[in-house]
């Protein structure tokens, strides 16, 4: 949630940022917040004046009583009594205004950093890095410098490879649950487990503490990280208990620090978690949902950082380097994109996506988003810290990223490593799989 301080002190910058994010009615929304804040401040000013006057009147009452002017003292007492009733009304007005401001601020997204490019959708994102020798603007790919010896004519898509080698049964998942809930079998299941353990081990090497959180959260947690109300329609909701299945471990792990005041010495906090993730993905269809491309349940490792404002940009760079390192070790063709304002998430200030190239599908698949949320999530969470030399608390910066989401990584591994003799396992993964080839 945007801070009122930012909105009041940098109104024009906030409006420009919201417009960059293609938030409709940006100026009207901010004007409405400012109007309610004006009412709150007016009530606060009147309350402060009344309290000051009441203090003076109390001193007058004492003096009048000493002088034997009881009638005058009683008259002032009546005024003070009436003022107390007025003050109660003013306090209620302030509370109502605060509630109204929170209601108005809740659906307003975060504003992007200045370096975020203009643009309305994915086609306006900027490719900032790739390990491909050739990477055209329209998803055309030439030779890539990772495993050039593995290329074969007419590569099969991962859903055909999964069937050929008995790795994943999509039909069985439909029988048990429905579309988007695959069943992993044999080496397919072992590959999943190997990737999870590999990603967690790499996160530990980078200083992340592993958390094993619940995969069901309450509404307050969904609100804290910004999934609610923005993504309510995409989350599975257990209506009887008013619980939500998590779409990402970001939700429970970040909410550990909801309503917490940290000491400066505790920062940065670096946590990671493996969880199953659940997304309704309403409106997805066609090639986007084939095979592992888009699932309702999937495995993902998330990295989460909480840091001081002056350190968060460097923390973001470290997280980007961590995710890139994973893709390098998996020997996959990848690229990194800086998302434009219109393609950013509701809560992010800046976001980079990592995509891997699907050899058989001939297109890029997103496998990670790494975001800095500035104080936006922290303000909703009331996640603060206190500097060693200052009693006043400040909002933390929160960051997170996928490191990594498994389905499309598995798809890319199968497609990009298929040979005439089977599917090769990247060297870094062999200690975790216990086998070098799927045949």
Each predicted region: which residue ranges?
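N-terminal alpha-helical targeting/anchoring segments
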Residues: 1-135, 140, 145
């Amino acid at each position: 949630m945007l801070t009122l301080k930012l909105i009041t002190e940098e109104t024009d910058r906030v409006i420009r940022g919201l417009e960059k994010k293609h938030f409709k009615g940006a100026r009207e929304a901010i004007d409405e917040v400012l109007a309610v804040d004006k009412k709150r401040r007016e009530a606060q000013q009147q309350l402060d004046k009344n309290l000051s006057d009441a203090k003076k009147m109390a001193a007058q009452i004492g003096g009048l009583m000493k002088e034997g002017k009881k009638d005058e003292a009683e008259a002032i007492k009546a005024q003070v009594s009436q003022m107390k009733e007025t003050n109660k009304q003013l306090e209620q007005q302030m509370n109502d205004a605060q509630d109204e401001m929170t209601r108005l601020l809740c659906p307003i997204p975060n504003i992007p950093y200045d370096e975020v490019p203009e643009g309305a959708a994915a086609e306006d994102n900027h490719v900032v890095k790739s390990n491909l020798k050739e990477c055209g603007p329209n998803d055309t790919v030439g030779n890539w410098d990772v495993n050039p010896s593995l290329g074969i004519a007419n590569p099969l898509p991962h859903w055909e490879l999964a069937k050929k080698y008995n790795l994943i049964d999509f039909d069985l998942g439909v029988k048990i649950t429905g579309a988007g809930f695959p069943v992993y079998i044999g080496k397919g299941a072992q590959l999943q487990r190997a990737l999870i353990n590999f990603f967690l081990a790499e996160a530990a090497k980078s200083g992340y503490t592993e958390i094993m959180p619940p995969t069901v959260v309450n509404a307050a947690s969904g609100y804290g990280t910004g999934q609610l109300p923005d993504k309510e329609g995409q989350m599975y909701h257990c209506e009887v208990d008013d619980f939500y299945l998590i779409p990402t471990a970001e939700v429970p792990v970040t909410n550990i620090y909801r309503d917490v005041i940290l000491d400066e010495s505790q920062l940065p906090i670096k946590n990671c978690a493996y969880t199953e993730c659940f997304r309704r993905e309403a409106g997805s269809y066609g090639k986007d949902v084939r095979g592992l491309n888009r699932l309702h349940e999937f495995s993902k490792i998330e990295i989460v950082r909480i840091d001081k404002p002056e350190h968060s940009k460097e923390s973001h760079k470290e997280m980007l380097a961590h995710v890139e390192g994973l893709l390098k070790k998996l020997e996959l063709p990848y690229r990194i994109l800086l998302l434009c304002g219109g393609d950013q998430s509701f809560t992010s200030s800046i976001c980079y996506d990592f995509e891997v190239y699907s050899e058989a599908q001939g297109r890029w698949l997103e496998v990670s988003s790494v975001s800095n949320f500035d104080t936006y999530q922290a303000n909703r969470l009331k996640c603060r810290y206190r500097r060693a030399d200052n009693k006043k608390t400040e909002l933390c910066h929160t960051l997170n990223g996928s490191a990594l989401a498994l389905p499309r990584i598995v798809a890319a591994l199968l497609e990009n490593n298929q040979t005439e003799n089977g599917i090769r396992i990247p060297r870094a993964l062999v200690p975790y799989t216990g086998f070098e080839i799927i045949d």
